[in-house]
C-alpha cells in the first residue's frame, strides 16, 4: 500500500481525522482537508498535505484536488467525511438548514466525484468511501436531515458504482453507529447490542480495508459498523 495517495475531506477532527491517521500508519500518502484549519496541521503531522477548505465550497474542493495532484501527481482514493447537519423537530427545520445539509452530505460527494473520476480513469482505477450513518436506512427522528440525505447518498453510491465499475472505480459507504469521537451518552449505549460505543480506530481500519486491493470485489455497498444497533437484515 505504501506510496498510494488518498484524500480525506472534513478530517480536522473526529472520525475523519482518525481515518487519516490510520491510513498514514498503513503507508498511504495522505492529503487532509477541513474547514476549521485543523486539517492543515494534521496533514503536516502525518507527513502529508493539509488544506483549509470546506467540502461545501466547490472552489475549495477544486483547490484541494489540484494541490494534491500538483504535489504527488495522482490520487488513488478519496474518503468523503462530513460534519453533522442541523438536528431538530422535523417540520421546524428551515429550508436553509435542509439546503445546507444537502450541500454538506450529498452535493459534496457529487462534486468531488466529478473532480476525481477523470483522474481515476486516467490512472486505470480508483476507489472512494463515503462516511454515512447507521440511521440512513432505519430513520431516527433525532437526526432527520442526516437520515434523509444520507439515504440519498446510499442511492448515489450504488448508481456511481454501477456506472464506473468497468473503469475499475469503486465506491462504498460506511454507516457508523455511536462512536467515541463524541461524548458518550448512556441512553445511546444501551441501544447497542455490543453494549459500548465504537472506537474510532475500528471504523478507520474498516475504511482502510475498503480502500485496499483486498476489497477489490466490493462496490456499491452500504456497510454498517454500528455494534448491531440496526435491526434489519
Per-segment meaning from a language model:
Residues 138, 219-233:
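Short C-terminal tail/terminal secondary-structure segment
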Residues 81-86, 227-228:
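Conserved NAD(P)H cofactor-binding loop of Rossmann-fold oxidoreductase domains
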Residues 118, 162-166, 216:
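Alpha-helical segment proximal to the catalytic Tyr-Lys
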